[in-house]
Structure formats: structure tokens, C-alpha cells
UniProtKB/Swiss-Prot annotation:
Region of interest (Disordered), ranges: 1-81, 736-879
Comp. bias regions, Polar residues: 777-791, 821-838
Species for this entry: Dictyostelium discoideum
Active site: D1130 (proton acceptor)
Biased composition (Basic residues): 1-10, 738-749
Protein name: Probable serine/threonine-protein kinase irlA
GO biological process assignments: IRE1-mediated unfolded protein response; mRNA processing
Gene: irlA
Bias kind Basic and acidic residues: ranges: 68-81
Protein kinase domain mapped to chain residues: 987-1261
GO cellular component: IRE1-TRAF2-ASK1 complex
Acidic residues compositional bias, start-end: 25-43
EC number: 2.7.11.1
Coiled-coil region list: 57-97, 715-759, 860-971
Length: 1431
């Protein structure tokens, strides 16, 4: 009989955990006890044998003693062997060597427990059953249990076996029983109740040994035979298992899974449902790669098996709703469905209850999302017919031409059935040169074509995704496991497959596939777009993409050939950018300018096969280009970043482009030579140069090939050798030297002629001024009886090209007979300048002669200096000087002839001639003086203008320096560590003064080394046309608009654009948040009013007026934008900055600008989360100028209420209040004009919102003069007989139209509100004025109309009279002797000006003016005839 292992001396097992050491010690004690018992039995047997056999001898006793010693030795050896096995098993367990476990040992355990009857026999006492089993272990079995087993492990085995019998006797409808069901089922059976409590089970299942046990036991021992038991065990007790245990079970199943285990997905499903941490980590994108490497379970297994059960366990209803409502936020999920074609999971999504509840009224959105995801990953199984119908739109296609048989009217109205869901070409990471996905795309597009649908030719640009833990790591995982990276060899940065480049170079679907170079895919796309007889237009393909493909050094013949079959490739590339055209027109010859600003594609081919194909379709081998033209087009076309990059790659091209003084045409062979492209050079030579055998082409020099190419291909007439070319160069140099010599000679001759002309002019002028008329002619005096010979010689100097001649005319005049002309004598050639003309000395005074010489010498010196200074002038100046010299000479000849005639008459009438000559001299002197005065005046004016300009420039510089000094004093000093162009700034974190969307940063910096600016750094990738838009903003803000932030300058590099803005102190939001807004208003408020009445009210009035003046700054800025047809679209306190005590508008990034490149400055639209956008913006409707009016209304409320918002201060509720039109204007209830204007400006109906002009005409913004005019016009309006009726007069006394049920405007008679002494003098002055007027008109005293103190009309009359006659009233008060000095001083403050009078009545009746304004708006008054107000 087997002894129970637990004796009374041992402590009961209970629920205390039995460690392996305790079990080992108890086993050793039992072994020792067994040995002692065996020895006692042997002794008793010996005694009996001795008694029975009396003839026994002593030898037997000796043998027995020897046998006992041998047995002791054997037992010691067995103990050592047992200890050896025990140590070995413990080592295996510590090293996690699960293969060392004996499968048969565990089978023996299970064979003893497999029967449910054994639990009944022991009355479900687990301790008793545990004692029985371990009391008689098989060989070595005790060592296994001693080192490994514990009561918890045994207890776990029992729970698993009990789960196999759990369905007996309970409701079979329970598919997923829980712990309560298990407990209720077994709680009344034996003593099991004390073992299956929650605490005991939790303690057992979280034991450290459970990990090793489940790693081996579940798979090796249980699952092959007890599949239902294992599933039920996890279902019932899964929530008690720790994450480590659950992960161990999952890894064992996932690592050693076989096809025999059909219930594997059921076990994984139960594990997912029972442990939240395990479920979260299994669907994590961050850990997917790591878990796959460790052969652990991930969500990819779900999509790979297309198992809806596992999917329902992995994704709970909240997850499903999120996937349906926001599919783009979890693109990895839809990517897995698309890659593995998980149609059953998709069907489950459609049929699931959360989806059905969400579908109400939103089926189209869901179907659109599914269709878009299906198109993104080219999965046709995701697109059922009903989903495709939701994606089909009737619209026109860019670049697709309808069949030609249609007439023009039908062709214009032709629409296509377009499928918009193919967005897979947007994501270059998944598609770019990926053969597996390309094959899916081919089949997908073929299905679309079979349905008669057209693909949308427009490809949307993908956005730069900011790397985060989810999307970035998951994309990397997809690249590693499902796609391979593709990078072009020897490609520049612009054409690497990056998302930034897809943003910069937007293209069509055909161009995108041409870049991908997948021929089969391109073929099916072209077939789709040309189905039903359609053809492709020129704009269907982006020529920049085609240019980049042709420029690749690899050859993709099939793609280009396929494209050419459907879309003929043009012979030349044309860049339509304005900068390129302007550059071409300015630098290129006629053959390259204007509309011919194109370059043949053959000059961009770097592969000889590509070049051959292009030459085969267009035989343009004789075309030529200009190198600088090619460089500019290559840069504008996106092939290279700048010239430096081109020159680094092609040094010969740099040398040729820099040496060219004038554009020179270059043929294709010479261009390929400059590129050092040997393959293309050999191809051109073998194909087109027939004089050289093809096999000898590689041996011929490139220079010889160029000569032969010019002769045979370019059709040059003569062969030029090196010697002839050198001789031609020598001749050209000699010709240049000769031309230079001739130019120098001409300059010298012209200078000499100019000197001679100047000398003669000076001499003649001096003779005219200093000598009498007789000295102007050379006379030979003879006696009266003899004739008098008068010889006049005049020398003329010809030009530098003609010879110099002089003619002398001599005339003989007799006194009595008539005058006789002597024969003309031809003089010899002109003498040199050193020789003087032969004139008698006595006829010329010495003084005049000396002065003439001095003047001539001075003039010569001055002329020499002038000539030396003018030697560097152009030939045009010399021509002008020559022409002027000839005119002077002609005039001098005419003067001399006239003087000769005058001299003859002077002999007859000397006195008259002398008088006339004196008059002429005086006149000439006066004219010269006048000319000199005019010249001096002009010089003075020019100097004054220059001085004024210099002063203005100095003033501007001083202002800029003062501004910079002020800003530098208020701001911390800038230590620049980065410079771009004229900008210098520091990229330190402390130097950042603003942040924006898409990585935009604003730094404090310096422009032009002295002016502080704000430098805004923006990424080019988000807006490739940002430079042009900044140019528009710079021109826009330079139009003297002081209420807009100034856009000063821009610079750019490879990644960013840097914009210089006016550096402002802070924003309006900063003022409010720092609680310095009131202090700012008070500091910037200036007033000249000093009063002694109601200073608090005056302070409040001035405070409000300052706020309104600041608000006018914002209105003027918006008015400036609206005049330019620009809507700001993002007005809020953060975009209103403080600059020099005024407000300026900033951040035109969301303005709707009429720019050729784009209509928005950034790609981000306003979200409206801050509550400054109207409902039409929130609903994404058409935006008009009224959007800014709504924002202005919110800002006006914000300013007047110290930072409050008209739709609530809670940002989360503002949007809802705007949508439901629930403003809260309670803070403005005591400011009626502001309340009225704000209510109109924030009206939900955009048509009811006022314009900018209407806002500025509102009474809230009236000046003092406008208010005075309004009172005067109001009185005239009330005097109108049509308005003076009792009905109209009484209407002013009430707030409402109904005078019976309305509220009185005056709470008491208005004479009780005004000071008594003032009303008395106002009445007296009114009576006096009426008497005076009546006496003047009728000379009779008429009845005086007295004031009625309960009528608003009379109050208006009183105010008007006080404004007009305030001086008379003040004089009468000061002359009154009974009044105390304080009253007189008070009256002086109130009546010293119209402004003080108006301020006094506004303090007494603050709502009167606006009350009149509202009443006059009504149709009962004919206010338009009197008031010039736009209501």
C-alpha cells in the first residue's frame, strides 16, 4: 500500500506556495526514513531466520554485514546520480532550454489526470490529489517535479482539465463563458470552493514559473489533445494572466504553429480579448518590424489570413468607427487591406454594427474613402460596383480631346465619366519603380477601362509628412518588407524620388508614369485616356517631366516610344516661365529670342540611344543653340540647381560660356564634345559623317570630326585648316590695331580743331566787346585825293578731313565817284596758329591787345584742360562739337560781312555808326549778363535740389538709425551666426520671435548691416511659387500704406525663402495676455482738454477715442487690401502688431491674392478654431470681403471689452456659437453705438454686414466737427414743416416707434440735468437773438418760442444754440457780478470752444446723438434731404 506523502508532522499544504527547495528537502527526508525502515525489516527477518534455523553459523552474519555495506555504497552512488540529474534539470530550466523537457514525462502526468473521475474520488481536493500523484513518481520523475513543479503549476493543470468538462450541465448557448460562470458551476462540488477564489487563481496564474510552463506545456502537452479546454481556459481565466504569460502563449503558438492546429486563430482571438496591453502592442506601427524579427504576433497576420474573427478582436468598435470616419489618418490599415486583398475584413467593416450606426446619411463619404483607398493601392477587390458609382463624376479632363467627329458645340460640352479614386501615383514611396505594385496598378487600370471610365489626369501633390512614431516608422517598415528603395544613379537632387520634389514639380498622371519608367503601366494608362476615340492634347504631358526623362543618362526606349505612339513628342522644349523669356530676350540673338525661346530635345539627351530615337522622329541634326541659353533652360527646367552645379559636372562648358563675348551657335556634335560624351559623339559620327568608316570613328580626333561634321552635315563650303584659322586670327588682330590707330588720330585732329575754333571764337568775341567798329576792319589810310584801299582778310578753318583755305576780299572806294569793287585776291594757305594776321598795330590799342592775348591764353589753357578731360568721351560728342564749330564760323562770317557794310556807311556817317555800335555793344553785354544770370540761377536751383535730396536722404537715414537704436535699446542684442544675402540673424532658440505652420520660423535679424528686421524663414516645398508671391507683397506694401506691415526684401537658398519684415514690438494678443493693454492705451493717449467737470467721464471718453483711433488703423489697412481686391482671411489679435504706438496688419499668408502663380500664399486654410471666422469659412463656402468685416467686428469687441470675445471666452464653444448665431454682447450694453456696429459686423448673413465705408461713416467714428454738423442739420430737419408735426416731434421722445407704449428717452426734464446758471443764459441769449432777428426783418417784436423741457427737439435746439453762440453766452456769464468765481471758471471750461461745449452735453446726455441717428434712419423722417449720411 502506498504511503501518503504528507504526514501529520508536516505542515498542511494549504494555499501557501511550495518552492522547489522545500519539495527537495521533504523528498530527502522521506528517502532517509525509507532507508531506516528497510534496515529494521531486514533485522527482524534475520532474527526470525535465526530462530527458525538453529544450525545457522557465524558466516551468514558476516555475509549479511558485507551485503549491508555494499548496499550503503550503492545508495550513495544513487544519491550522487540523483543529485547530478537534479542539478542538470535546474540548469536547463534556468537557461530556458525547453527542449530538455521530457515529452513522455508530461504525458504520464496527463494520463493520470485525464479522467474527470479522479476529481470526484478526492472530492475535488487539489492538495490531496497533488499528494497522491507525487508520492509514487516514475523513475526520475521525482527529480523533475522537485525542481520544476509547484502546487500552482499542478493547480493550473487541473483548471485546464476542468475546463474541458465545463459545458456539461450548463446552458450550451454560452459561447464565451467567464469566471463567474465557471465559479457558479463548480462552487458546490466538494471542497473546490476554497481553491477557486479570485485571489488564489490570480496568485497561481501570475507565478514566475508560468512563463516557462506555458511556453512548453501548453503546446507540447495540452493543445494536441485538449483544444477546447485550452480555449475555454483562456476565455475564463485570461484576465488573470499577466501580459508576460499572454505574450509567451502567443509566441509559442505563433512560432511553432502548424496546419494541424485549426483552432490557432481562436486562441489568439481570446488572448487579444483578455489583455488590453497585448492587443495594443500587436497593432502598433512602431513595433511591427521588431515583433516580426522576433517571430511574434502582429496585425499583419490578421490581414494576411483575411480573418474577420481576429480582426474583430484586434480592432474594437471605437477603432472601427475611427477607421471609417478618418481613413486618411490610418493609411497603414488600408495599405494592408490593399496589399493582402483582405476582402472578408472589408465586408465585416461594412456589416459591423458600429459602421451601420455611423452610416446614417453618410454612406457616400464612407464609400468615397474606401474607393480612394482602393485606388491608392490599386486593389480592385475593394471596389464593388456600388463603390465605383459613388466615385464617378461627369466632368471635363485636362489634356483629353473628344473624338473629332463631334461638332464644335458638342466638343465644348463633352464630359467624361471620370474615376477620381486613383491616387496611388501620389505616394512615390509606394509606387516609384515598384514592380509588384505596378502589376497591381496595370490590372486595376484595365478593369477601370473595361467599365468605360476615364482616369483623372490631374495628380494631386502629396504633403510632406512630419516624421512621427506612427507614420514614419511604418513607412520605413513598408519600404523594407514590401518595397525596395529606388534611387537613380548619377542623378541630381531635384530628381530624387522625394516628397519634396513631388511638391516642387507637380505633374500629370502621364508625366508621373513616364518618370517611373514602367512601360506596361504607361501603355494601359494611355489606352484608358484614348478610349472611345479620344486623343491627347499638348498639356496632357508636363514637358519638364519629359525633359528630365530624356536627360537621364540611362535609356528608357520603351517608355518614350510608347508615349510617342499616343502623344507625339515635339522637337523642341519650351519653357514658359517669364523669367526665362525675359532673360532670353535680353541676352540672345534674334534666332533665340521671343517666340523662338526653345531648345531641341536632342541637346538634352545624354544617352546615344535616346539621341538616336529623337533624331529618328525629328531630323533636326542641323539645329544649333547658344550655350548660355541652354544653361538657363536647364536650370529653369529643374535639371540642375544653379550654374555652379553645371560647371562642376562639365568644365569645358564653363570655359566656353565664359569666353564667349557674343552668342555663338553650337551644333549638336560640338555640344556633345563640350559635355565629353563619347558615346553620343561616336554615334553622331558613325551615323551622319559618311566620309569616315564606322570602325575608324573611335580613332579620329574630335577636332577633325567637328570639321568634317561642318562640311558634310552643316554644309560649310570650305575646309578650314588650322593654319588658315590661325592666319585669320592674325588678320583680325592687325585690323583691330589699325582701327585703334585711326580712332586715336581722329581724336587728336578733332581736339586740335576744337582748340582752333575755341580760340577764334574767343578772339572774335573779345574784339567785339573791347574794340570800336573801326578796329574790326584793317584799313590802309591814303590822302583824300587818292583812293582808299580797305582790305579785309578773313581766314576760315575747315574740318579735319578737308584742306584749309583763306580768302581775302579787297575793295577800293573813291570819295566822289560811286563805289567800285576791286578784284578779289586769293590768299595763300592758312598760316600756323603761332603766326598772327598782318594787321597794323596802331589800329589796335595795346590794352585791348594784351587783354586779348591773356584771354586767348587762358582760354587755350582752359580748352586744353577741357580737351584732356574730354578725351575719354564718345565720337558722338566730337561730331556735335564739329557741327557747333561750323555754325559758329558761318555766323562769324555773316557778322564780318555786315560789319564791313557798316564800316562803309560809318565813313559817311561816323557819328550815327558809333552810336549804333555802342547800342549794339550795350545790348550784347546785357544779353550776356542775362544769360550768365540765368545760368547762375539754374546752377543755384540744381544745387538747391541736390541739397534738398541730400537732406532728405540724411533725414531718412537718421530716422532709420533712431528706429534701429530704439529697437536695439528695447530688444536684446543680436549675435548673428547665419547670413543669407543682406540678412543676418541668429538661429538660436532664444532668437525665435514667432512660429507658423509647415515649419515656418520668425527670427530677429538685421538687414543691410544696420536696420533691425524680422526674418521669416519659410520652406519652398510647401509653395514652389512663393518667391513670385513675395515680390507681389513687396510691391503691394511699398505703396505708402502705413497700416500694413512692410515687406522689405527677400533672399533664398536651396531649401528656404527668407522674407524681411518690419520688426514690431509685440502683437495685440501679447498686450492682452500680459495685461498691459490698458497701460498701453493710456500712455499713447494725448489730449489738450483741461476741464473741471466730470473728469472720469472725460477720461473714459478719451480712452475710448484712443481705442477707436487704433481700430481705424486696422480698418485702413483692410480698406487698402480691399481696394487691391485682396481678402486677408485670417484677421485675429495675433496678426495685429504694435509698431511705433500704432497697429499694423501682418501675416498676409492666407490672403486671396490675384497672382499668376497661385491664389494663396500658403497651402493651409484657416480652421476657425479661434472664433474669428464667420460661418461661411467654417462651411468652406466662397469667401468674400465680408469675411474680414466679421473678423473686424470681433476685434472691435475685443478692443472695447479688454480682451473678451462676442461669442464667448471659451474657445471650444465659440465655433458652436458662431454656427448657431448666439453672440453675447452684454459687455457693450452701455455703449449703444458700439453695440449697434458690432451687431451688424458679426451678422451671420454676410449680406447684412456693412462695408468699410459704411463702418467709417458710423456715428461711433464721428469727429467733433461731424457731430456739430449733425446737430445743426438735425435742427434744420426738425424745422421742416413735414417733420414739425406733433407726431414726429413726439417720436423723438421715445426709444421705440410706439409713443404710447415706448420708454421715454428723458427720465426727467432736461433743464434739471443742465446746470441752472447755464440754462438761464442760454435762454436769455436765445431771446436776444430772436428779438434782433425779428427787428431786422419786420421791425416788430414777435412772440418768442420758449423751450419745452420735456421735448427732445428743444434739447437739440438748445445744444445747437450753445454750440453756435458759446462766446456770447460765456461773455454774458463772465459779466454777471452775482456769480461766484468758481462758477465762472466752470463756465469758462464748458464754453471756451465748440469742442468743450459738445463734450459737456455728451457728459450730460451720452446717448442723445445715437438716439437721433437711429430715429432719423426711420422712414417717417425725410432725413436724406438734410443729412448727408449713408444709413
Amino acid at each position: 500500500m502506498t504511503k501518503p506523502i504528507f504526514k501529520s508532522k508536516t505542515k498542511p499544504l494549504g494555499w501557501s506556495k511550495i518552492s522547489s527547495k522545500e519539495v527537495i528537502n521533504e523528498d530527502e527526508e522521506e528517502e532517509e526514513g525509507g532507508e531506516e525502515g528497510g534496515e529494521e525489516e531486514e533485522i527482524d527477518n534475520n532474527k526470525n531466520s535465526n530462530n527458525s534455523s538453529s544450525n545457522s553459523n557465524n558466516n551468514n552474519n558476516d555475509n549479511n554485514n558485507n551485503n549491508g555495506e555494499e548496499r550503503k555504497v550503492e545508495k550513495e552512488e544513487e544519491k550522487e546520480e540523483i543529485n547530478h540529474y537534479r542539478n542538470q534539470f535546474e540548469k536547463d530550466l534556468l537557461d530556458m532550454e525547453l527542449k530538455a523537457l521530457n515529452r513522455e514525462t508530461i504525458d504520464n502526468i496527463l494520463s493520470g489526470l485525464n479522467s474527470y473521475e479522479i476529481f470526484k474520488e478526492v472530492n475535488f481536493d487539489f492538495e490531496k490529489l497533488y499528494s497522491i500523484i507525487i508520492s509514487e513518481p516514475p523513475p526520475l520523475f521525482d527529480t523533475f517535479f522537485d525542481s520544476v513543479s509547484s502546487f500552482e503549476i499542478f493547480f493550473t493543470d487541473c483548471l485546464i482539465l476542468l475546463c474541458s468538462n465545463f459545458p456539461d450541465g450548463i446552458d450550451t448557448s454560452i459561447t464565451r463563458p467567464n469566471f463567474n460562470d465557471f465559479y457558479n458551476h463548480f462552487k458546490d462540488r466538494g471542497v473546490i470552493n476554497k481553491y477557486i477564489s479570485r485571489e488564489n487563481i490570480h496568485k497561481a496564474l501570475n507565478d514566475k514559473l508560468m512563463t516557462d510552463y506555458f511556453n512548453s506545456g501548453i503546446y507540447l502537452g495540452l493543445l494536441d489533445t485538449l483544444d477546447i479546454a485550452a480555449i475555454r481556459f483562456i476565455t475564463i481565466f485570461g484576465k488573470f494572466l499577466s501580459y508576460e504569460v499572454v505574450e509567451t502563449i502567443s509566441n509559442s503558438l505563433f512560432r511553432y504553429r502548424t496546419d494541424k492546429i485549426e483552432f490557432l486563430s481562436d486562441i489568439i482571438r481570446e488572448l487579444l480579448l483578455c489583455n488590453e496591453k497585448y492587443r495594443t502592442l500587436s497593432k502598433s506601427y512602431d513595433l511591427v518590424q521588431k515583433r516580426l524579427q522576433k517571430e511574434e504576433f502582429t496585425f499583419i497576420k490578421v490581414f494576411e489570413d483575411d480573418d474577420p474573427k481576429l480582426f474583430s478582436a484586434l480592432y474594437q468598435p471605437p477603432d472601427i468607427i475611427k477607421l471609417i470616419t478618418e481613413p486618411e489618418k490610418d493609411s497603414g490599415f488600408w495599405c494592408m487591406i490593399g496589399i493582402f486583398k483582405s476582402k472578408r475584413i472589408l465586408d465585416y467593416l461594412i456589416r459591423t454594427e458600429p459602421s451601420k450606426s455611423w452610416f446614417k446619411g453618410k454612406e457616400s463619404d464612407y464609400f468615397f474613402s474606401i474607393a480612394e483607398m482602393g485606388g491608392k493601392y490599386f486593389n480592385w477587390t475593394l471596389l464593388e460596383p456600388k463603390l465605383i458609382k459613388k466615385e464617378v463624376n461627369q466632368k471635363s479632363l485636362k489634356g483629353v480631346i473628344p473624338p473629332r467627329e463631334l461638332n464644335s458645340q458638342q466638343r465644348n460640352t463633352q464630359f467624361f465619366r471620370v474615376f477620381n479614386g486613383v491616387t496611388g501615383f501620389n505616394d512615390i514611396r509606394f509606387v516609384y519603380a515598384n514592380p509588384s505594385l505596378a502589376q497591381h496598378a496595370i490590372k486595376f487600370i484595365q478593369k477601370v477601362t473595361e467599365c468605360g471610365l476615364f482616369l483623372n489626369t490631374d495628380v494631386r501633390n502629396v504633403r510632406d509628412s512630419i516624421p512621427n512614431s506612427n507614420s514614419f516608422l511604418f513607412r520605413k517598415f513598408l519600404e523594407v518588407n514590401f518595397f525596395y528603395r529606388y534611387e537613380k544613379d548619377n542623378e541630381v537632387y531635384q530628381h530624387q524620388p522625394t516628397e519634396e520634389n513631388s511638391l516642387l514639380y507637380s505633374t500629370s498622371i502621364i508625366s508621373r508614369i513616364v518618370e517611373m519608367e514602367v512601360t506596361d503601366l504607361l501603355s494601359v494608362v494611355l489606352k484608358n485616356l484614348t478610349q472611345q476615340g479620344c486623343s491627347l492634347a499638348r498639356e496632357a504631358v508636363d514637358e519638364r517631366s519629359l525633359l528630365s526623362t530624356i536627360h537621364s543618362d540611362k535609356y528608357y526606349n520603351s517608355s518614350i516610344v510608347v508615349l510617342h505612339n499616343y502623344w507625339p513628342i515635339p522637337p523642341k522644349f519650351c519653357d514658359c516661365s517669364t523669367s526665362f523669356i525675359s532673360m532670353a530676350n535680353g541676352k540672345l540673338p534674334r534666332t533665340y529670342s521671343g517666340s523662338d525661346g526653345v531648345i531641341p530635345y536632342i541637346f538634352f539627351a545624354r544617352n546615344h540611344l535616346t539621341l538616336g530615337f529623337l533624331l529618328s522622329i525629328h531630323n533636326n541634326i542641323t539645329d544649333t543653340i547658344d550655350i548660355n541659353h541652354w544653361i538657363s533652360v536647364a536650370i529653369s527646367g529643374g535639371l540642375y540647381y544653379d550654374k555652379e552645379e553645371i560647371f562642376r559636372k562639365y568644365p569645358l562648358l564653363q570655359k566656353e560660356s565664359t569666353l564667349q563675348k557674343y552668342p555663338r551657335p553650337v551644333n549638336i556634335l560640338e555640344f556633345q564634345t563640350l559635355l565629353e560624351n563619347n558615346e553620343c559623339i561616336e554615334y553622331i559620327a558613325r551615323t551622319f559623317i559618311k566620309e569616315i568608316p564606322p570602325h575608324e570613328v573611335p580613332t579620329v580626333k574630335h577636332s577633325d570630326l567637328l570639321i568634317l561634321f561642318e562640311i558634310s552635315v552643316m554644309k560649310k563650303r570650305s575646309i578650314r585648316s588650322k593654319e588658315s584659322l590661325q592666319a585669320e586670327l592674325d588678320l583680325i588682330e592687325e585690323e583691330k590695331r589699325e582701327k585703334k590707330k585711326q580712332k586715336d588720330k581722329k581724336k587728336n585732329k578733332s581736339n586740335q580743331n576744337q582748340k582752333n575754333n575755341n580760340n577764334q571764337n574767343n578772339q572774335s568775341n573779345n574784339n567785339k566787346i573791347n574794340s570800336p567798329s573801326s578796329n574790326k576792319l584793317t584799313q590802309n589810310v591814303t590822302p583824300p585825293s587818292s583812293p582808299v584801299n580797305i582790305i579785309t582778310s578773313s581766314s576760315t578753318t575747315s574740318s579735319s578731313t578737308s584742306s584749309t583755305t583763306s580768302s581775302t576780299t579787297s575793295s577800293t572806294i573813291e570819295p566822289k565817284p560811286p563805289t567800285q569793287t576791286l578784284p578779289i585776291k586769293t590768299s595763300s594757305p592758312t598760316k600756323p596758329e603761332s603766326q598772327k594776321p598782318s594787321t597794323p598795330d596802331p589800329l589796335i590799342p595795346k590794352s585791348s591787345k594784351s587783354t586779348t592775348k591773356n584771354n586767348n591764353n587762358n582760354n587755350n589753357n582752359n580748352n586744353n584742360n577741357n580737351n584732356n578731360n574730354n578725351n575719354n568721351n564718345n565720337n558722338n560728342n566730337n561730331k556735335e562739337n564739329r557741327e557747333m564749330a561750323l555754325e559758329v564760323i558761318n555766323e562769324m562770317e555773316k557778322i564780318e560781312i555786315e560789319e564791313s557794310l557798316l564800316s562803309t556807311s560809318s565813313l559817311v556817317q561816323p557819328q550815327q555808326q558809333s552810336q549804333q555800335s555802342q547800342q549794339q555793344q550795350e545790348q550784347q553785354q546785357q544779353q550776356q549778363q542775362q544769360q550768365q544770370q540765368q545760368q547762375q540761377q539754374q546752377q543755384q536751383q540744381q544745387q538747391q535740389q541736390q541739397q534738398q535730396q541730400q537732406q532728405q536722404e540724411k533725414q531718412q537715414e537718421q530716422q532709420e538709425q533712431q528706429e534701429s537704436i530704439q529697437l536695439n535699446q528695447t530688444l536684446t542684442p543680436i549675435i548673428p551666426d547665419f547670413q543669407i544675402g543682406k540678412f543676418k540673424f541668429s538661429r538660436d532658440e532664444n532668437n525665435i520671435i514667432g512660429r507658423g505652420s509647415n515649419g515656418t520660423l520668425v527670427f530677429r535679424g538685421i538687414w543691410n548691416d544696420r536696420i533691425p528686421v524680422a526674418v521669416k524663414q519659410m520652406q519652398k516645398a510647401f509653395n514652389p511659387h512663393i518667391s513670385k508671391e513675395i515680390e507681389v507683397l513687396i510691391r503691394l506694401t511699398s505703396n505708402n500704406c502705413s497700416n500694413m506691415i512692410r515687406y522689405i526684401d527677400q533672399e533664398e537658398d536651396q531649401l528656404f525663402v527668407y522674407l524681411g519684415l518690419t520688426l514690431c514690438e509685440e502683437s495685440l494678443q501679447d498686450l492682452m495676455e500680459s495685461k498691459r493693454y490698458k497701460e498701453f492705451i493710456e500712455k499713447t493717449t494725448t489730449t489738450n482738454i483741461t476741464t473741471t467737470f466730470n473728469n472720469n467721464i472725460i477720461d473714459e471718453n478719451l480712452y475710448e477715442q484712443r481705442i477707436l483711433s487704433l481700430f481705424k488703423d486696422v480698418i485702413n489697412g483692410i480698406n487698402f487690401l480691399h481696394c487691391q481686391d485682396i481678402v486677408h482671411n485670417d484677421l485675429n489679435p495675433r496678426n495685429i502688431l504694435v509698431h511705433k504706438g500704432n497697429f499694423v496688419i501682418s501675416d498676409l499668408g492666407l490672403s486671396k491674392m490675384q497672382v499668376e502663380t497661385s491664389y494663396s500664399f500658403t497651402n493651409n486654410a484657416p480652421t476657425g478654431q479661434e472664433g474669428y471666422h464667420p460661418i461661411e469659412v467654417l462651411q468652406e463656402k466662397r469667401k468674400t470681403k465680408s469675411v474680414d468685416i466679421f473678423s473686424l467686428g470681433c476685434i472691435l469687441f475685443y478692443l472695447l471689452t479688454n480682451g473678451q470675445h462676442p461669442f464667448g471666452n471659451n474657445k471650444l464653444l465659440r465655433v458652436a456659437n458662431i454656427v448657431y448665431d448666439k453672440p453675447d454682447l452684454e459687455p457693450l450694453k452701455f455703449n449703444a453705438p458700439a453695440l449697434d456696429l458690432v451687431r451688424l459686423m458679426i451678422s451671420q448673413d454676410e449680406k447684412k454686414r456693412p462695408t468699410i465705408d459704411t463702418i467709417l461713416n458710423h456715428p461711433l467714428f464721428w469727429s467733433t466737427n461731424e457731430k456739430i454738423k449733425f446737430y445743426e442739420s438735425s435742427l434744420n430737419l426738425l424745422k421742416d414743416p413735414n417733420n414739425s408735426q406733433s407726431k414726429h416731434s413726439k417720436l423723438l421722445n421715445y426709444y421705440q416707434n410706439d409713443n404710447s407704449g415706448g420708454v421715454l428717452f428723458l427720465s426727467k426734464p432736461w433743464n434739471q440735468i443742465i446746470d441752472p446758471f447755464l440754462i438761464d443764459h442760454v435762454e436769455n441769449n436765445n431771446n436776444n437773438n430772436n428779438n434782433n432777428n425779428n427787428n431786422k426783418q419786420n421791425s416788430k417784436k414777435l412772440a418768442i418760442v420758449a423751450y419745452q423741457y420735456d421735448q427732445v427737439r428743444d434739447l437739440v435746439r438748445c445744444i445747437r444754440n450753445s454750440l453756435v453762440h458759446h462766446k456770447d453766452i460765456l461773455r454774458s456769464i463772465t459779466q454777471q457780478q452775482n456769480l461766484p468765481p468758481s462758477s465762472k471758471e466752470f463756465a469758462n471750461d464748458c464754453l471756451k470752444s465748440q469742442e468743450s461745449v459738445l463734450l459737456y452735453f455728451e457728459c450730460k446726455f451720452p446717448d442723445l446723438l445715437f438716439h437721433l441717428y437711429q430715429q432719423f434712419k426711420k422712414s417717417d423722417f425725410n432725413s436724406k434731404d438734410y443729412l448727408n449720411i449713408k444709413f
